[in-house]
């Protein structure tokens, strides 16, 4: 039912971490800022290495570079305002700024989903059809696949942002989160949001279930091909090229599915925040981990090993923070 005699909202306030004590907020600020800087530097290192080393000018590393760029933009869309909110918890955000944040969050988040799917297809072609790999995964095809992923992200984001901010927001202006998210914004609308929730669910299915299904099919075919390899060493190398990508896929789609595909009745504010904190800080560190071993068994360069060490540090920090967050919530 629409709410009558209400004033339309022009700005929102994030509830974020307002329930925590000030000393806890300062600890979170230091941890988040450190992880944020490590994330940015780690992605820049990866992009620089791929750009400078001509041996890495392959489809696999092209998509890795695109994923690093996308993850960097995704992180920049969320974390800076969250850090500001930890120091100034009562800082409002204008509806236009909230819409902008949601747009970039959705664009690059959805782009990440489809880039991971494309990377799975790349591994499928490399292992199941190696003789035609260079023909199928040519420069033009790689650019088209990367552009298609971004195009889908832009299209889905426009649909979602237009759907959400076409609603009236009256009286209620406190978002029970630390960034502008579709599910939490819909709760503040002073009108029926059934259609919007259906749109959100359909988009979530298209962005999560469909890519997950494609990745699953790719890996079924990949595993069946690997098992046919006579050499145990050959099987090991083939599995190694896919293991890190598969790990990232499970974490990425797993966290996103828990947040966006579960029924509204099972939505838990504390659980959503915990998963979102882990997701937004953990996922951006992962592109650097999707570095399959060279099929020829060559060792990574010193720069690549350094980048991986930085990522390991980031992942340990994220895991430690998540544990602390659970205990303090």
From Swiss-Prot:
Transmembrane segments: 27-47, 56-76, 101-121, 141-161, 199-218, 239-259, 273-293
Extracellular domain ranges by topology: 1-26, 77-100, 162-198, 260-272
Membrane topology recorded in Swiss-Prot or TrEMBL: Multi-pass membrane protein
Cytoplasmic topology ranges: 48-55, 122-140, 219-238, 294-329
Keyword terms, alphabetized: Cell membrane, Disulfide bond, G-protein coupled receptor, Glycoprotein, Membrane, Olfaction, Receptor, Sensory transduction, Transducer, Transmembrane, Transmembrane helix
Keyword rRNA processing part of the UniProt annotation: no
Gene Ontology biological process terms in this record: detection of chemical stimulus involved in sensory perception of smell
Full protein name: Olfactory receptor 10J3
Organism: Homo sapiens (Human)
């Amino acid at each position: 039912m629409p709410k009558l005699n209400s004033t339309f909202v022009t700005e929102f306030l994030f509830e974020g971490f307002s329930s925590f004590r000030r000393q806890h907020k300062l600890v979170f600020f230091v941890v988040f800022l450190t992880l944020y800087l490590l994330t940015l530097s780690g992605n820049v290192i990866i992009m620089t290495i791929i750009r400078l080393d001509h041996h890495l000018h392959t489809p696999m590393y092209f998509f890795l570079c695109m994923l690093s760029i996308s993850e960097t933009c995704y992180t920049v869309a969320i974390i800076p305002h969250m850090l500001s909110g930890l120091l100034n918890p009562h800082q409002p955000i204008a509806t236009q700024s909230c819409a902008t944040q949601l747009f970039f969050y959705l664009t690059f988040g959805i782009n990440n989903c489809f880039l991971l799917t494309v990377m799975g297809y790349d591994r499928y072609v490399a292992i199941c059809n190696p003789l035609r790999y260079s023909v199928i995964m040519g420069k033009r095809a790689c650019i088209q696949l990367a552009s298609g992923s971004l195009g889908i992200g832009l299209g889905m984001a426009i649909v979602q942002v237009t759907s959400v901010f076409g609603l009236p927001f009256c009286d209620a202006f406190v978002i029970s989160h630390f960034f502008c998210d579709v599910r939490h914004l819909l709760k503040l609308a002073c009108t029926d949001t059934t259609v919007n929730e259906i749109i959100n669910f359909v988009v979530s299915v298209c962005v999560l279930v469909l890519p997950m299904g494609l990745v699953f099919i790719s890996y079924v075919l990949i595993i069946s091909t690997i098992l046919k390899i006579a050499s145990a060493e050959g099987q090991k190398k083939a599995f190694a090229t896919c293991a890190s990508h598969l790990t990232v896929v499970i974490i990425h789609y797993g966290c996103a599915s828990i947040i966006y595909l579960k029924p509204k009745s099972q939505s838990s504010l504390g659980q959503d925040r915990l998963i979102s904190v882990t997701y937004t800080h953990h996922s951006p560190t992962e592109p650097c981990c999707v570095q399959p071993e060279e099929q020829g068994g060559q060792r990574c360069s010193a720069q690549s090993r350094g980048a991986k060490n930085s990522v390991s540090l980031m992942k340990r920090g994220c895991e430690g923070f998540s544990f602390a967050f659970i205990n303090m919530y």
